[in-house]
Curated annotation (Swiss-Prot):
NCBIfam families with a match to the protein in the record: PRK11194.1, rRNA_mod_RlmN
UniProt cross-references to Pfam families, sorted A to Z: Radical_SAM, RlmN_N
Protein name per Swiss-Prot or TrEMBL: Dual-specificity RNA methyltransferase RlmN
Function, as annotated: Specifically methylates position 2 of adenine 2503 in 23S rRNA and position 2 of adenine 37 in tRNAs. m2A2503 modification seems to play a crucial role in the proofreading step occurring at the peptidyl transferase center and thus would serve to optimize ribosomal fidelity.
Gene designation per UniProt: rlmN
Cofactor: [4Fe-4S] cluster
Active site: E105 (proton acceptor), C355 (s-methylcysteine intermediate)
Assigned keywords, A-Z: 4Fe-4S, Cytoplasm, Disulfide bond, Iron, Iron-sulfur, Metal-binding, Methyltransferase, rRNA processing, S-adenosyl-L-methionine, Transferase, tRNA processing
Amino acid sequence: MSEQLVTPENVTTKDGKINLLDLNRQQMREFFKDLGEKTFRADQVMKWMYHYCCDNFDEMTDINKVLRGKLKEVAEIRAPEVVEEQRSSDGTIKWAIAVGDQRVETVYIPEDDRATLCVSSQVGCALECKFCSTAQQGFNRNLRVSEIIGQVWRAAKIVGAAKVTGQRPITNVVMMGMGEPLLNLNNVVPAMEIMLDDFGFGLSKRRVTLSTSGVVPALDKLGDMIDVALAISLHAPNDEIRDEIVPINKKYNIETFLAAVRRYLEKSNANQGRVTIEYVMLDHVNDGTEHAHQLAELLKDTPCKINLIPWNPFPDAPYGRSSNSRIDRFSKVLMSYGFTTIVRKTRGDDIDAACGQLAGDVIDRTKRTLRKRMQGEAIDIKAV
């Protein structure tokens, strides 16, 4: 269980009210104790907040009027607002969500048997992966708990209101939007706790996935804080290529990264013994059959399934998209070694909502010193 105290950074209004979306259940119970109330009131309010997407205390009919009045004086339920919506021809929806004076992007991906929400963890990204649009926008700041879980809350409210249109409720959440989640563990972990909590969104730990590019110290801490499904952004079969396209590899190389992954798998039940490998296919960079053989050798001791991701272009990018024939040959080599290999279907590329295309609106792109410091750091992570 993570611990994040209710501090001034949780105060979101000029009147000094606490945003209850910033609190996991443990913190919510402490909040109600401080109000002189029984802790079960926290569970009641959380159920209203997350099961019914309710942000109005007056609508919480099993809460007495006196307590509702007290809550209105000291607290609020404020999710970030959607400022723009784009709908793809394939049913994918991308929302631009206002966080202060910036925007992040959240993507809803419906399928026949599920609906996945891709959630952002930072405004921009500090890791500067060369093939990713988000990285080219620079880095501004970490998102708070309310800004992370608020993306899920806002999407659930929109989708819930649209049930008559047949939109599927959210069944899966992937921390694969803007940012590196492991560089924001103090906010990402409490948000994921709310996703898993029965009084929160009640998702299975196998249906909440965190994706990382390889912040090794933070990955080791993650396993002591929460158990969720893990995906790793590998994208290269050797250090030479990965140093170039995923610069954090210069600090934590592939061998070090995969060793940390195996340590996480030993602790985790959510992953059922194997990790998901994400591998973006860049034309004549990492997509040759020789690269496939190298990748198979590299992963022989790491139980995994492999997702091959056709690269999604963005303006001024230095790469090209691998042809279907090159992807097919690459996939067949991996399968010949016995790896479960899936070529990910591109979704939402007509609205720039596909993998690697999220950019948001990062107002301050000048924080290069902070960005460099954050590369490879697990900053001020608390675990209890």
